Amino acid sequence: MSLQSIRYKRGMLQVLDQLQVPHVERYIPVSTAKEGWHVIKEMHVRGAPAIAIVAVLSLSIELTELMDHEKLSTEADEVEAYILEKLDYLVTSRPTAVNLSDAAIKLKTLVQKRKQIGDPKGKDLAEAYVEAAEKMLIDDAMDNHRLGDFGATWIVNNTPVGKEGKKVGVLTHCNTGSLATAGYGTALGVIRSLLASDKLEHAYCTETRPYNQGARLTAFELVHDKIPATLITDSMAASLLAQKGAGLAAIVVGADRVVANGDTANKIGTYQLAVLAKYHGVKFIVAAPRTTIDLRTKEGEDIIIEERAKSEVTRITGPRISDLGKNEENITLETVNIAAPGIDVWNPAFDVTPYDLIDAIVTEVGVAEKNADGLFQLEKLFGFP
């Protein structure tokens, strides 16, 4: 049974509380856009694709509730303004992840176009929104399977280990699997596709400080799916790449935003992995759906980088050792301080990897590689010349 970060049916949305995974599997009910904003901002849900889906579905639940109780305005103008205002609000929850703003723009456009058809009532606009949001959930899972297959094929065909017909080793960072998407995953989806085609030798995942998404979430998924894998600390990556016997063919990461020239914002620590990959001759691959590509932003220096609370670096949360193996209801999670009191902290959530350190950008429609001039032409992924 696959892991689910999002449980949805019309009128019901539940989000897996990823702050408690892997020790406790608890789902948080979400019934309004405000509740959606908070589960995203407080990182109960994370991963750019999952953030977008939870955001748009939270408003879907709110609109469905209003329609069911006949509290929705009958005026199309009022419902249009209501939806647009809520979408703008939801986008503020995590500004770096472009998937959310992309989904909001698409849904705004849909609602505005629906208002121009015939003489719609407020309910017509709300129903159009709900149907479109639900389709985004379905499409994301399907796109991830295609993306995973494209990425796996590229690694096999474009790395020395793969060309020799050997199984490949892959290193990944943060969490990009079923818990970060509607299902299957992006970078972790590539690893799943390698395993499915019997091309995976071993997967490695970084712990991904300071939030430990790799140690808590990616490791959880790898164990759940019985994928051969090893956890390393972030500072061990260079030593791993230097091990000739490791058989590492590629580093595969996800993305929160890929801009027009290919510069990529992703979880803090991604940039240093790209530098290490370049030095050691290991392919560095970004795996992300087209919803993560932001052609409106030209270069990485224009990306807004979210900075988070100092306490995320100075404290850590987990169960007491004595509680391990107990039933979930008997597990107590405790937070302890791990840093010297009074020390200053810098805590950017993301960094930007320059395009020239990236070998390929894998999407659900194919793989983008640099041209003879060393430049990505990402607009071609959207059918532009």
Curated annotation (Swiss-Prot):
GO molecular function terms noted in the UniProt entry: S-methyl-5-thioribose-1-phosphate isomerase activity
Pfam families associated with the record: IF-2B
Biochemical pathway: Amino-acid biosynthesis; L-methionine biosynthesis via salvage pathway; L-methionine from S-methyl-5-thio-alpha-D-ribose 1-phosphate: step 1/6
Residues the UniProt record annotates as site (Transition state stabilizer): C174
Superkingdom, taxonomy of origin: Eukaryota
Role summary: Catalyzes the interconversion of methylthioribose-1-phosphate (MTR-1-P) into methylthioribulose-1-phosphate (MTRu-1-P).
Protein's name in the database: Methylthioribose-1-phosphate isomerase
Gene that this polypeptide is encoded by: MRI1
